[in-house]
């Protein structure tokens, strides 16, 4: 027979496992401090990038503010088929079924018209 302490521990572990399987919550990968450090690095990169662009524009010459600026618009063309997937349990499927059906109705006719 198991002792009362072992039984209590197993019961707590089982309850925690059941709760974890039922939740749809967000599990943070990074700590709050790590996220702040990453944001600071991104800001620093952005400042560094804007300074280098500013220096290049000064080398070329002053830009007339009345002159319209042409911005490059890039279009990414896929050379291979792309497949996007997601996993859902039955409870999530019941919850989001109507939304998914609507998205599929919009996506499938548009892909048939394109072919």
Swiss-Prot record:
It holds the Pfam family Motilin_ghrelin. Keywords: Cleavage on pair of basic residues, Hormone, Secreted, Signal. Residues 1-25 form the signal peptide. One of its GO terms (molecular function) is motilin receptor binding. InterPro entries: Motilin_assoc, Motilin_ghrelin, Promotilin. One of its GO terms (cellular component) is extracellular region. Its main location: secreted. It is found in: Secreted. Residues 43-73 are annotated as: Disordered. Belongs to the motilin family. Plays an important role in the regulation of interdigestive gastrointestinal motility and indirectly causes rhythmic contraction of duodenal and colonic smooth muscle. This is Promotilin. The lineage of its organism: Eukaryota, Metazoa, Chordata, Craniata, Vertebrata. The gene is MLN.
